[in-house]
Structure formats: structure tokens, C-alpha cells
């Protein structure tokens, strides 16, 4: 499309992208990839015009004002849905449209198009999930669920980005308050919708939605080496971020599986995979999955030089040591522990469907909360401190009920 658009401005693809004679429009839009892009506009020597891009210059933005572009996107969705996929992660949904005099984020036109997508999905593919990737504050993201009264008419799910850095912050500060405060500020969502919560993903651990002081603190604690940083975040995997500390990894995973929302695990974190900060940009955390100690970590039978990214050769995180095969053969492995925790979550509907109520705790290092759905009531207590901690909880409401330990047997 882009090659045709740049060659023939008056052709069928001429206005599939956003073109301009200069780079002066949309000056209120921030630059997202501050490490690599000096502008949201790039000059094309073929068409001799500038094209608009919110991310890399090799990722020109489609022109959603063009109804033919909308139809093309709907056709692409239908193609994959007809093949039987379960849903879509809708990347960067706040940036579909640009409008002069705005920051070009969260515009009404974006929501209008998402409603159209949702209507198409509901009409012909009713079991499909639309997951919004909107790196914004919860009060802005909640709009991507759509109309509250109707139960939601845009996306079924949306990532909750600000929770992630605050879990890391809470552990280093040994205080529940970073997590408690962001959850308290999270607005209610439509009844048929759900947050998607995560610890890490294929991008950097974003620090956009923290204060400058908090960002400096996170860099000092988790990314002392400048190579560990990218854009406004940290490009490391979960295990290296936590110094491969099994207790901390278990705490983070237990929080992921018990906080409100649907947990989204990043591949390899279940076996404690590492990263490669010598690779460029976001590739540090995108190395091949480590299945076995064999050639290419069992990921591919091709010549190693043909892999899109090299396997990790680190003595601690290298595929010869850290892999699924080795984890499966060890009953005490992180993989088996994670599977047991997921099974516990599945056995208790309160985690997936229940309400969330934080309980007052006498110890700031301890967060305690209830998950409740119908007759299923679960008390979760997490310790952010490095050491064992006492705490007092007021559980008089449950006098006469008998607690059953879910994990310890």
C-alpha cells in the first residue's frame, strides 16, 4: 500500500496514509519514541511530501479518515476470524486519528471506529475478544470499553499499564501504597469487560505514567546500566529485573494471578528466561523461546545465523540451563509452581469474576484484599518486605467461617 501511495498520489492508494507538504501540522502531538525519532513527520523523496507516523519512521500511519482504509481493516479482521482465531490485541488504539489543535490521542473518531469494529465482531464472530493496548491513565483507558450502561460496546478488555511499574516500586520500597493507590484510582468498568494485567511484555517496562522522581527511582533500582533503558522505560525481562530471586518472582506472579483483571503472562517468564541488553532497541526481551538445551534452544531447526534474533548464551539464563525441558523434569521448578498457581486461580471463580476489596492492614509492607464472587470468598495477603512481617486484619465480619489454605495443602 505504502509503495503504491508514494508512487502515485492520485492513485487508489494515494490517500491511504497521512501526507502533507510540510511538517508543521499536529504540533501538539508528543513524540513517543524519543530515543530514535526527532519528529512525527518524515520526508519521502519519492512523493516529495511528508508522511505522518506516531512511532518509527518505517511505520507510516494509515489514514482512517479514508473509508476505504476502514473497509480494508475490517476485511483483514474478517480474514483472520474466518481462520478461527480467538481475538485481537489492538495495538496503539489511542493514535488511530490525528486532529489539529489536539494531542492526537483518545479522539472521538477513534472510539467511533472501534464501535464499528465491535458491532462487526458481535454480529458475525460473537466469541471474539478485542483487547485494547492503550498506554494511558485508567480514567482515559476506561473509555475504550465503550458505553457503560450497555455493558461495553468497544473493546472487551484493556491493558492496565500503570499497575505494572507500581508493583516493582512497591517491592523496592517495601510498601503496599504504590499498588493500593493506583487501584483506588482505577474507575469502574462495564459489567462484561475486564482489565488485562501483566508484569512484562515485548516492549519496555513503561515509566510514562509515573512522576519524574519515581522514574529516576525506578531507573536507579532496576536499570543502573543505560543499556537497560529504552525510550521512557526499562527493557528487561522479569527474572533479571528481580536478580533471579525466586521468592520475588513468586510474589510478583502471585500478585498477577490474584489482583483484579485477567493475568497475561509473557512467554518465557514462566521458566525464568533472561534477556540480552546488547541487542538493539526492544529486541533485548524478544529472543527465541527456550524449549530445550538443543540447537537454537529447540525453537527452530534452521542455521543459527538465520534466526531473527540470537538465542541467549548467558551462563545463568542461557538456553542450555534455562529451558522448558529442564523445568518439566524438576518438580520444584518455577514452571511447575506457576502451573499450580494458575490451577488454583481456575478453581476459584472469585479471581476471574469477583469483586476486589482491600482490607486495612496494620503493616504498610503487607497488602491484604478479598476477592468475592457468589459463595466463593478468597483472602489474599502479600508481603512486599524482604523479611517475614506481622500484620493485623479485622476479620470480624467472617466470624464463624473457617479459612482453608489454598496453597499450602
Where are these predicted regions, by residue range?
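Active-site and adjacent substrate-binding regions of carbohydrate-active enzymes
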Residues: 1-409
